[in-house]
Amino acid sequence: MGATGSGPFENDDALDFLDEVHDLPRQDRAGKILGALDVVLRATDYVEAPVMCEAVAGAAAVGASVNPAASQGEPYLPEWLAAEPLPTGDEELVEKSRQVLRRAVRSHDNEWWELWEEAGLGADVTASCRRALAWLGDRDD
């Protein structure tokens, strides 16, 4: 049975991506997430939903590592993040995570957003991205 929900970890693409991250040696995990963030941030045209989904999951995983107490209770939060958080001293990783979460809720050239909006869940995914932004210390105001 697949996972499907508006939270950053509540879908199969996100969970599969984070499983791939977890399977890497700890020192390579941030690089894998940074790669997913960069794909979205460097995109000059339409971003497909699975690509955005991986980037959002990676950004939220960084946020959960920055502020584990605030992210507790988030549906499908990978258990390994509590025991093996991502490095939070990497300001580039944190800032790019913020940028991706902001980009995710913009409709321009963004299939991920379009699908949520068509399903009537745009407000829900906006709230989940804002929650993850708050974990990163950004209120997004």
What is each stretch, according to the model?
Residues A57-E114:
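Amphipathic protein-protein interaction modules
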Residues L24, D28-G31, C53, T88, ...:
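Alpha-helix boundary/N-cap detector
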Residues M1-V47:
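Short terminal alpha-helical segments
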Residues G35-N67:
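Short, well-structured hydrophobic secondary-structure segments
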Residues E20, K32, A36, Y76, ...:
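Charge-rich, solvent-exposed alpha-helical interaction surfaces
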Residues L93-D141:
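Low-complexity intrinsically disordered segments
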Residues A14-L18, A55-V62, E114, E118, ...:
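Amphipathic alpha-helical elements of HEAT/ARM-like alpha-solenoid repeat scaffolds that form extended
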Residues L24, A43, S65-P68, A104, ...:
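Residue-level signature of the C-terminal ends
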